[in-house]
Design a protein with these regions (language model features):
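Active-site/ligand-binding-proximal alpha/beta "capping" segment
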Residues: 63-115
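Short, surface-exposed amphipathic charged segments that create phosphate/polyanion-binding patches used
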Residues: 58-61, 80, 123
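Flexible domain-boundary/linker segments
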Residues: 50, 54, 71, 78, ...
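Alpha-helix initiation/capping motif
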Residues: 22, 47, 88, 114-117
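RNA substrate-binding interface of SAM-dependent RNA methyltransferases
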Residues: 1-71
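Structured adenosyl-cofactor binding patch, chiefly the S-adenosyl-L-methionine
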Residues: 11-14, 24-41, 97-141
Length: 141
């Protein structure tokens, strides 16, 4: 969680802890607070069910899914000026069907010949946010 939170904070985003919970204990753990290097204190945190928030957010929602479109396909639209939402599920269960119904862009990190099916959530978040923001920057030039 701390590595993911630092990446989210760097991009000026909010975080929904534990990907669809109203349970604040995950962020209050001493190890999480310490390893976030203070970044946790500068991050907007939403404590409500993710599906409820997505239903009214009015922004494009990107979901990291194994059957998504490759980020390198050239056809994934970049985030809008109003921003976007990136949803990353856990490695075992993925993104719940309740949350998937709000995803407007199903994306994936292409596999370049390796055999790994998925990545650590923090690593996936870093790659996905960098690629999505790079697409936004390139489009505006």
């Amino acid at each position: 969680m701390p590595a993911l939170e630092r990446r989210i904070n760097k991009t000026g985003s909010a975080v929904s802890p534990k990907c669809n919970t109203t349970e604040p204990r995950q962020l209050c753990c001493t190890k999480v607070v310490q390893s976030s290097m203070g970044s946790l204190l500068r991050t907007k945190i939403e404590y409500r069910p993710l599906a409820e928030w997505l239903a009214g957010c009015g922004k494009p929602v990107y979901g990291a899914l194994l059957d998504g479109e490759s980020l390198w396909s050239g056809t994934v639209p970049p985030p809008t000026e109003e921003g976007a939402v990136l949803v990353i599920g856990n490695e075992g269960a993925g993104i719940s069907p309740e949350v998937q119904q709000y995803i407007t862009h199903r994306v994936k990190i292409p596999n370049l010949g390796g055999t790994a099916e998925s990545l650590n959530a923090a690593v996936a978040c870093a790659i996905l946010t960098a690629e999505l923001l790079r697409g936004k920057v390139c489009q505006s030039k």
